[in-house]
UniProtKB/Swiss-Prot annotation:
Family: Belongs to the UDP-glycosyltransferase family.
Reaction catalyzed: glucuronate acceptor + UDP-alpha-D-glucuronate = acceptor beta-D-glucuronoside + UDP + H(+); 2-hydroxy-17beta-estradiol + UDP-alpha-D-glucuronate = 2-hydroxy-17beta-estradiol 3-O-(beta-D-glucuronate) + UDP + H(+); 4-hydroxy-17beta-estradiol + UDP-alpha-D-glucuronate = 17beta-estradiol 4-O-(beta-D-glucuronate) + UDP + H(+); 2-hydroxyestrone + UDP-alpha-D-glucuronate = 2-hydroxyestrone 3-O-(beta-D-glucuronate) + UDP + H(+)
Gene3D superfamilies assigned: Glycogen Phosphorylase B (3.40.50.2000)
GO molecular function per UniProt: enzyme binding; enzyme inhibitor activity; glucuronosyltransferase activity; identical protein binding; protein heterodimerization activity; protein homodimerization activity; retinoic acid binding
EC number: 2.4.1.17
Places the protein is found: Endoplasmic reticulum membrane
Subunit comment: Homodimer. Homooligomer. Interacts with UGT1A1, UGT1A3, UGT1A4, UGT1A6, UGT1A7, UGT1A8 and UGT1A10 to form heterodimers. Isoform 1 interacts with isoform 2/i2 suggesting that oligomerization is involved in negative regulation of transferase activity by isoform 2. Isoform 1 also interacts with respective i2 isoforms of UGT1A1, UGT1A3, UGT1A4, UGT1A6, UGT1A7, UGT1A8 and UGT1A10.
UniProt protein name: UDP-glucuronosyltransferase 1A9
Enzyme category, top tier: transferase
Glycan attachment positions: N71, N292, N344
One Pfam family here: UDPGT
């Protein structure tokens, strides 16, 4: 765009700024994951769009939330399943969580309810069957891929088109984060997923931690077998998870050391925990009325996340009984069957503005499944928690918050009505919980750059520089025995043994020489006396 005919310097400056903005704008391919994963990724995508970048989102035509109301190009591809199939498999998965808690990598990866993951894994095969879409992506000359790695498809796309990638994740299942980033994770103080251990493990816990690590190496490849077969088929060469993850330019990790335990990190790992926290907005009149009616006691916010829509009747009644025994008004996000014993102080809603409610000064506690979104909103707003984890990283999140004195954890399958009542009264009446969560909130907010701005910066950085090779450790170029210096240890051990052997031989030779000489002297002396 040419700017002519202006004599005033102000319009000229504006024009130059706009021109610079267009010159810096890039072209970004986004390969997201459905469900709650998309909620936070979307905020980064929207900010990138506002900054003038050309964004193309590739998504399956069957999804729950993907691509809605985005002001960018959205490309869809057909899937081998329907929305009814997706809902059915998801309900089976969610229902299984109320039967037994997943406490081992085996039960997580080998569960009979995991068919939903195979549906997600099949997406990439469907994408690459769409030759028209593949040709469009090939000709588009993207600067980078912004992806959620859960179903592997974004990783496959990045490798297929040889594009630098930015991974957006809370964490990576199994050991693929540490392996893909070549990041050390000492088992002596870095607990594995699902165990619910702190970083101060007992000897017994450290043994269990090592066993879990071995189980990951034995079982994870079976869980991802279908995904890797699809990847190998698309890339036309056998690949492993390491092959897919190891080319990541930047890891945007939705965690923060206010929640997680300190551990080794790599220079291309950027921490954006709390990216889902936003400035509180005015509450809808309906919820403002609930709070005003609660009086001096205030309210308790209760949500088990978007994945839990139904609770077994007996458990729902036990929960309702406990809620009825506290003086606070309880706002319970629940779409299941209304418990028959629901008390007058408990209000069921199909949706609630969770972050805005947690930010209200009359909120006394938060009952949560300890998903990362809810935990960070609780930290940001300084609200103590009663945590009822169900699956995935929720057990670990709950353990971390309990260790830091910011809440109480209950086993949702085994807890009684009395357990929940006591936990609620503890976090509401014991000031230490409020003080601890406020301290964590203060630490979390004391940062030079907001998580959203940090995420946007690093995506743009990869787009500008076509990757971040200067942050890639040389460990990727070493064999496993070179990485652990086994060849050096073997060489030095051989040198030490060789020196020791030569020294021993020399000493033995000298000893024999000395003994031999003494023996001859003694014999000569004896012959003279005779």
């Amino acid at each position: 765009m040419a700017c002519t005919g202006w004599t005033s310097p102000l319009p000229l400056c504006v024009c130059l700024l706009l021109t610079c903005g267009f010159a810096e704008a890039g072209k970004l391919l986004v390969v997201p994951m459905d469900g709650s994963h998309w909620f936070t990724m979307r905020s980064v995508v929207e900010k990138l769009i506002l900054r003038g970048h050309e964004v193309v989102v590739v998504m399956p035509e069957v999804s729950w939330q993907l691509g809605r109301s985005l002001n960018c190009t959205v490309k869809t591809y057909s899937t081998s399943y329907t929305l009814e199939d997706l809902d059915r498999e998801f309900k089976a998965f969610a229902h299984a969580q109320w039967k037994a808690q997943v406490r081992s990598i085996y039960s997580l990866l080998m569960g009979s309810y995991n068919d939903i993951f195979d549906l997600f894994f099949s997406n990439c095969r469907s994408l690459f069957k769409d030759k028209k879409l593949v040709e469009y992506l090939k000709e588009s000359s993207f600067d980078a891929v912004f992806l959620d790695p859960f179903d592997n498809c974004g990783l496959i796309v990045a490798k297929y088109f040889s594009l630098p990638s930015v991974v957006f994740a809370r964490g990576i299942l199994c050991h693929y984060l540490e392996e893909g980033a070549q990041c050390p994770a000492p088992l002596s103080y870095v607990p594995r997923i699902l165990l619910g251990f702190s970083d101060a493990m007992t000897f017994k816990e450290r043994v269990r931690n090592h066993i879990m690590h071995l189980e990951e190496h034995l079982l994870c490849h079976r869980f991802f077998k279908n995904a890797l077969e699809i990847a190998s088929e698309i890339l036309q060469t056998p690949v492993t998870e390491y092959d897919l993850y190891s080319h990541t330019s930047i890891w945007l990790l939705r965690t923060d050391f206010v929640l997680d335990y300190p551990k080794p990190v790599m220079p291309n790992m950027i921490f954006i925990g709390g990216i889902n926290c936003h400035q509180g907005k005015p509450l809808p009149m309906e919820f403002e009325a609930y709070i005003n009616a609660s009086g001096e006691h205030g309210i308790v916010v209760f949500s088990l996340g978007s994945m839990v829509s139904e609770i077994p009747e007996k458990k729902a009644m036990a929960i309702a009984d406990a809620l009825g025994k506290i003086p606070q008004t309880v706002l319970w996000r629940y779409t299941g069957t209304r418990p028959s014993n629901l008390a007058n102080n408990t209000i069921l809603v199909k949706w609630l503005p969770q972050n805005d409610l947690l930010g209200h000064p009359m909120t006394r506690a938060f009952i949560t499944h300890a998903g990362s979104h809810g935990v960070y909103e609780s930290i940001c707003n300084g609200v103590p928690m009663v945590m009822m984890p169900l699956f995935g990283d929720q057990m670990d999140n709950a353990k971390r918050m309990e260790t830091k004195g910011a809440g109480v954890t209950l086993n949702v399958l085994e807890m009684t009505s009395e357990d929940l009542e006591n936990a609620l009264k503890a976090v509401i009446n014991d000031k230490s919980y409020k003080e601890n969560i406020m301290r964590l909130s203060s630490l979390h907010k004391d940062r030079p750059v907001e998580p959203l701005d940090l995420a946007v910066f690093w995506v743009e950085f990869v787009m500008r520089h076509k990757g971040a090779p200067h942050l890639r450790p040389a460990a990727h170029d070493l064999t496993w025995y070179q990485y652990h210096s086994l060849d050096v240890i073997g060489f030095l051990l051989a040198v030490v043994l060789t020196v020791a052997f030569i020294t021993f031989k020399c000493c033995a030779y000298g000893y024999r020489k000395c003994l031999g000489k003494k023996g001859r002297v003694k014999k000569a002396h004896k012959s003279k006396t005779h």
